[in-house]
Regions:
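Glycine-rich phosphate/pyrophosphate-binding loop and the adjoining helix
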Residues: 157-234
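A polyampholytic, Gly/Pro-enriched intrinsically disordered region
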Residues: 61-62, 138-145, 165-177
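N-terminal beta1-alpha1-beta2 submodule of the flavodoxin-like/Rossmannoid cofactor-binding fold
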Residues: 1-89, 94-99, 105, 109, ...
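Short, glycine-/small-residue-rich phosphate/pyrophosphate-handling segment
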Residues: 117-160
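Short amphipathic alpha-helical segments and helix-helix/interface helices
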Residues: 27, 104, 132-136
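Second-shell loop/turn segments in exported
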Residues: 89, 125, 184
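Short aromatic-enriched loop/helix-cap "lid" or pocket-rim segments at secondary-structure transitions
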Residues: 49-54, 132-133, 158-164
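Internal, well-ordered alpha-helical segments in soluble enzyme and binding-protein domains
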Residues: 96, 131-135, 189-192, 196
Length: 286
């Protein structure tokens, strides 16, 4: 490979396959334009199942929220130096997925990312602001320069996806409830990632600087202000209960299990109350 060939590292973890497709769509125009892209799929030491088991799904949240991830296998990264790094991730309990956090906490990652321009590519249900704030902190710890963030969210509305996304993760069926829209990101939105990959390609091949203006005016990440309050409230709940559950686990695994069962029942009760009320309020307002 010639020294003048531009190189991009794309790191991702995909449990359902959706994020892998999003990452491929971003990488394709780069590869077609002659940019060398190393795509690295992170592998947990103990694989996460898909579909999830009910218990393991919920038991994952305390460590996820507190950035104490399960270990990953050492990723096979072919080169030591890249012109840019793309980190594609999904959101677990309003935090980056554990394998991504584990990658960013490796000493080898710090050496790799130090001083490098980084783009984050998020595929999630609809709430991502809290996860991205944690991502910013992790990147800053590694000395990386965050220059852009691209976000693709589920196609159906917030109330519906509150039900359809967990149903998909626990059953493996995107349309488990036939009366509700399909879970996941729309095909057109997944394909739209190529538009941003093409912009990075053009910037690299023109030897221009990769900075915060890279995806300016491209609609890379749209903030839904209506969700900010709900996300903050849920984030506080996850954080406090996560800390309590981890402390309980140090005393007794049975105590952690009992408290987690109580919290799950609390969450289900909230869903059964808040989702219908939310739908009713929206209908009345319209």
């Amino acid at each position: 490979m010639g020294n003048d060939v531009k190189k991009v590292l794309l790191v991702y973890y995909s449990q359902t396959g959706q994020l892998a497709e999003l990452a491929r769509n971003f990488a394709e125009p780069l590869q077609q334009g002659g940019v060398h892209v190393d795509c690295v799929n992170l592998e947990p030491q103990e694989p996460y199942p898909f579909p999830w088991s009910f218990w393991r799904f919920f038991n994952t949240f305390p460590e996820t929220v507190h950035l104490k991830p399960a270990p990953i296998l050492p990723p096979a990264i072919p080169a030591n130096d890249y012109d840019a790094v793309v980190i594609a991730y999904t959101v677990w309990f309003l935090s980056p997925a554990q394998p991504i956090t584990a990658f960013l906490q490796r000493e080898e990652t710090r050496r790799l990312l130090n001083g490098k321009p980084v783009v984050t590519l998020i595929g999630c249900r609809n709430m991502w602001l809290g996860a991205q704030e944690k991502m910013k902190s992790l990147l800053a710890h590694n000395g990386a320069k965050l220059i852009g963030n691209i976000v693709k969210i589920d196609a159906c509305n917030s109330a519906a996806s509150f039900i359809t996304t967990p149903a998909w993760l626990l059953s493996g069926d995107k349309q488990y409830f036939r009366a509700l829209p399909s879970a996941g990101i729309a095909d057109g939105e997944l394909a739209d990632a190529a538009r941003f990959g093409a912009k990075m390609r053009d910037t690299l091949l023109q030897n221009k600087t990769l900075d915060e203006t890279l995806f300016q005016n491209m609609g890379a990440a749209k903030v839904n202000e209506k969700l900010i309050f709900s996300e903050k409230a849920a984030g506080r709940s996850f954080f406090l209960w996560g800390r309590l559950l981890m402390a309980a686990g140090r005393v007794s695994p049975l105590l952690r299990r009992a408290l987690l069962c109580f919290y799950i029942l609390f969450l289900l009760a909230m869903i059964l109350v808040l989702v219908p009320v939310s739908v009713l309020v929206k209908k009345l307002l319209h």
